[in-house]
Regions:
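Alpha/beta-hydrolase superfamily serine-hydrolase fold, recognizing
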Residues: 1-293
Length: 293
């Protein structure tokens, strides 16, 4: 699937998808009017240290993916310190389940859902893939609806909070992680493990794309290397350290390469159509062996 200059993308903003107490979360929905359904769906999750920001960060990516034939959603999620782990993870899973339960009405294919995230968002989408259908982290939105993904992409993510906490705090501030996880590693070690995709990934992981900027001064590229190493025996993984800093996916000098690699990866694993071998639960580890899911 490729972008088309002649394609018009429509955006439906603030579609409610998750209600927690008195708080209603919304998503933005991007659809290309010139493309025919059913379309694979993509969930894009922004960063912000689990504490700041709102949907809209991925607007350019969403428009381009919509032009390439995807139905794209960019959801809100709950933020620290008002909400701690696993609240944001549950919200991302709710967005995935919304795609599966409601996406067909918008021209989406509920059997093909992918996700990409940056920074904190990368942690959330990769962790969502690693804990797919785990009752401990599933929303109450659509009981019985799967939160599994066909493929996932993480940009500049933190994937092992335990290793991150051991870094020199003068170089890498871990206070926001303690705020999100509810304390220090000594106080809540279980949260640091449960929130780390490195510790949660198993053979149910879908194919995964991991990119990290070589000059990232916020999250060290070693975090992505740890994730790639953990996934190596489990699933197909594409890992690369690319030019740029922490915000490389949004930098105009590097944007086209990131977009093209991502859409090519998603097309390979979710763009083949319903009933194909693309997606969660079918493809095995890189050696081509048959692995039960």
């Amino acid at each position: 699937m490729t972008r088309s200059d002649a394609t018009t993308v429509t955006v439906q903003r603030d579609v409610p998808f998750q209600e927690v107490g008195d708080e209603v979360l919304h998503l933005d929905l991007y659809e290309a009017t010139a493309t025919n359904g059913p379309k694979p769906m993509a969930v894009l999750v922004r960063g912000g240290g689990f504490a700041v920001g709102d949907k809209g960060e991925f607007a350019r990516h969403a428009i381009d993916l919509a032009e390439a034939g995807y139905l794209v959603v960019e959801p809100q999620y709950r933020l620290a310190p008002a909400w701690t782990f696993p609240a944001p993870l549950v919200d991302v899973k709710a967005a995935v389940e919304w795609c599966r339960a409601e996406g067909e009405a918008y021209g989406g294919d509920p059997t093909r859902v992918v996700a990409a995230g940056h920074s904190a968002g990368a942690n959330l989408v990769v962790l969502a893939a690693a804990t797919a259908d785990d009752p401990a982290f599933e929303p109450d939105l659509y009981p019985g609806t799967s939160s599994a993904l066909s493929a996932v992409a993480g940009y500049a993510g933190v994937y092992d909070f335990r290793a991150f906490a051991r870094l020199d705090e003068t170089e890498h501030d871990v206070d926001t992680h303690a705020q999100y996880l509810g304390g220090t590693p000594g106080e809540v070690p279980e949260a640091y493990e449960l929130a780390s995709p490195v510790a949660q990934a198993d053979v149910s992981m879908p194919s995964t794309l991991l990119l990290h900027g070589r000059d990232d001064a916020v999250i060290p590229p070693q975090q992505t290397a740890l994730m790639a190493e953990a996934l190596g025996p489990l699933t197909a993984v594409e890992h690369d350290v690319v030019p740029g800093g922490h915000a490389f996916p949004f930098n105009g000098a590097f944007y086209d390469d990131v977009y093209e690699r991502t859409v090519r990866f998603f097309d390979q694993h979710a763009g083949a159509g319903p009933g194909s071998d693309a997606g969660h639960g079918v493809s095995g580890p890189p050696d081509g062996g048959s692995t039960p899911r």
